[in-house]
Amino acid sequence: MSSTYSTNLGIELMGTGDQAGNWGATTNVNLGTLIEQAIAGYTTYSCSGGTDTLTMTNGASATARNMYIQLNGTGGGTVVVPGTSPNANTKLYFIFNNTSSAITVKVSGQTGVSVPAAAKIVLACNGTDIISAINYIPSATLPSPTLTGTPVEIGRAHV
């Protein structure tokens, strides 16, 4: 039986009886690299300002598998993440747009989400497109301002 790969993360699923004497190496890559990238991976990516495509290679370390991606380089472009074959890639992304212009994060052929310059955002790939993972933020309650000191009149000339 041949190995296959998981739908969302491209993790190798060894077939019964496969890789005699080598299963440990595959398991170590799956657990120590691929799953770790998916749930705690942090990487930086240098954007070109055009269309940049992040990949998720089956059974190997890949930028698009990381949970947190800091986008550096030239803003104003598009970052495309895998959304279809070989990986449906339904997963969360924490994105930090560390450029001076907005960047659109999307799946090829879709609209995606525009991430403003210097913004940090949580996005979700639903297998078809990138969407905002958060649609509710409770309102913040701010304390009333308190002014102290002596009042000063500004802008009035005394003759």
What are these regions (language model features)?
Residues A117-K120:
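Tight coil/turn sites that cap or link beta-strands
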Residues M1-S2, V107, P138, P143:
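Intrinsically disordered, low-complexity segments enriched in Ser/Pro/Gly/Ala and basic residues
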Residues L31-A40, S101-G109, A124-Y136:
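Short, surface-exposed terminal/edge motifs of secreted or surface/virion proteins that either
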Residues D129, Y136-H158:
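Low-complexity, small-hydrophobic/phenylalanine-enriched stretches
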Residues Q110-S114:
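Surface-exposed loop/edge segments in extracytoplasmic proteins
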Residues F94, V122-A124:
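Residues within well-ordered beta-strands of beta-sheet-rich folds
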Residues S2-I103, T146-R156:
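Exposed extracellular interaction/assembly regions and N-terminal maturation sites
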